[in-house]
Amino acid sequence: MANMVFSATIGAVLALMLIFSVSIDATTSTQNIFCTTDDERNHPILCHMLQLVEEDPREMADYLYQHAQENKWLVGHDWSDDSEFGKMSSSVVASTMSRQLLRSSASKDDNALPIVFAHGMGDSCFNSGMQSITKKAGEMMGVYSVCIPTGKDQSEDTNNGFFLNMDATVDVFAEAVQNDPKLQNGFNAIGFSQGNNVIRGYIAKYNTGTAVVNAFLSINGVNAGEGAVPHCNPSLSKSPFAQKLRFDVCELLMEQASRAAYTDFAQQHSFQANYWRDPRPSAFPRYQQYAQLAKWNNEAGFVNQTLKDNWAKTNTFVWVLATEDGMVFPREGEWWQSPDPNDPYHSVLPMKETEWYTKDLFGLKTADEAGKNHFEKFEGDHLQFSMEDFERWIKEYFGK
């Protein structure tokens, strides 16, 4: 049984989780269109932020983006060759990206599969880092490459990463895939952080017909769920909008990393609540009852055979772990390991000892025995991989 490194501050974290799981007075000056009085009492932070998203979506998205940037949750935002993108507005970046892809399409191998990206929390397909890595991947492999947003612009795409639930996000993603003629013969997929849940959800629900995921590169995915409050520094923003916020993004995540995640309201309005997997055995029944992740894992008390059948249609799975990941707990979950129920905060079960493997709940064991699972890692924190690593991964696993 492998040992896990766990922060000495666990006592403080658990205390804060308890604080945010109890009732807090969340009276607002205007009627919250999403929340009943009970919702506001049980989910004060989520309700407050949902209201602000409705009132000023652009300001909220800018705030979330800045917070993600400060915490290094974004892919490639500090790459040296991003400056040309950083000088342009989101709409110009998207237009430029489309033109570049169209210009090179004539020289592409028509038989090679395109690449589809799903971004992580706080990021957006309209941001420079995602635009840059999408372009790089297409050029490396000589294929059509696209990042699929879950909103019509940067603001909606960013906000939806927090406030559109996981299942609805997958439906939006799937509709975009179905409407793109270049993806109808199948594609290879790359997920970053919680974007892996989008790809995974697509495989679970939509991996049928011809538009199937051939190979799935999962980089620092919360595949096995999130079991603790992720590394999160409070925002440094001094903007007028930030002053309107009574709560910080870290407090929002902390509220979802608690009993508050396991309610119908949280599951409907919070992407992060959908994959909160409380590692304590006492919490497992509520996880089974409420969490979207439990349904996709076939942990909800019944087996959906369609999920297993759809999983089997993907030929290659590449699971990438960051050795110092401070966002995903346990970080070994990026390799489908899970907290040991007997000591959930200090020890993990190897993948082959987990229940989802031994019982082959959704097809992980079948895929492993067929040689479909591959495991990679890089030294460093969440999403801080090198371009050399990225190029090696896609050339090795997408070039087959």
What annotation goes with each model-predicted range?
Residues 262-331:
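Serine-hydrolase catalytic core
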Residues 33, 119, 167-283, 327:
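Serine-dependent carboxylesterase/thioesterase catalytic core
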Residues 124-126, 156, 197-199, 224-228, ...:
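Short catalytic/ligand-binding loop motif for oxyanion handling, primarily in non-cytosolic enzymes
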Residues 107-110, 181-183, 190-192, 208-212, ...:
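Extracellular/periplasmic catalytic domains that process cell-envelope and extracellular macromolecules
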Residues 2, 6-11, 19-139, 145, ...:
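Flexible, membrane-associating and regulatory peripheral segments of lipid-active enzymes
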Residues 149-162, 227:
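Glycine-rich "HGGG/HGxG" loop immediately N-terminal to the catalytic nucleophile
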Residues 116, 146, 190, 217, ...:
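Hydrophobic/aromatic beta-strand patches that form the interior of the parallel beta-sheet core
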Residues 48, 306-400:
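C-terminal catalytic-base region of ester-bond hydrolases, centering on the histidine
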